[in-house]
Amino acid sequence: MASMLGTEKYGEISYFISIAILASTIALLGMSTTVIVYTSKGVKIQSTAYLSGIISAITTSIILFYIFINDVGISIYIFGFVTFTLITSNYLGQKLYSKYSKINIIQKILLVIFAVGFYHLMGLEGIILGIGISFILFFGIIIKSFKEMKIDYSIFRSRYKFILNSFLLDLTRASSGSVDKLIIAPLLGFALLGNYQLGIQYIALLHIVPGIVFKYVLPEASRG
């Protein structure tokens, strides 16, 4: 992607994706970890968590839509990211690792196809839009879950402290990976941010294995 865009445009797209990721994390309301942990315990929390995430994502998307002067790409990214994250969290909680792997691989393939395709049609805005669409295509899985289990907000009452802690933890993680880019871009420009982001990508590779281990251990430990 960087070789196709050049460092300045790559920095610009990294800046807007960082905004979208941070906003998406806020919109998730800590539901990702909550779904993983309580689904692994057999609690039927999915539909309630999905509805909460959808309402929050729509609200956040509308706010960002007007902030960025009717840029629908970021809004679609937020809604898609939230719903896709909740779907994969459910798979992890149920220990459906094969489904989790397949859906992630398919999404990554779709991401490349749509991001590159929409870039050639629309420019930089098309990349974020393409990524968002690659997430949203799996929304039907959430619709199906609404038919299989009822929405019950009483489930949250005794678990609000855990949900709050999960939200703060997720927000801290997202901030550590996004705030630096939000500072660098306005102060030093997109070109420098592009070079900075390229360097960060190599460091991110080192965190892939620990991240996979964490996602496997969390539902296992929650059951124990």
Describe each PLM feature range.
Residues 2-22:
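Extracellular/periplasmic helix-loop-helix junction of adjacent transmembrane segments
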Residues 25-43, 203-224:
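Helix-loop junctions and terminal segments of transmembrane helices
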Residues 4-7, 93-94, 121, 187-190:
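Helix-loop interface residues and adjacent transmembrane-helix termini in multi-pass membrane transporters
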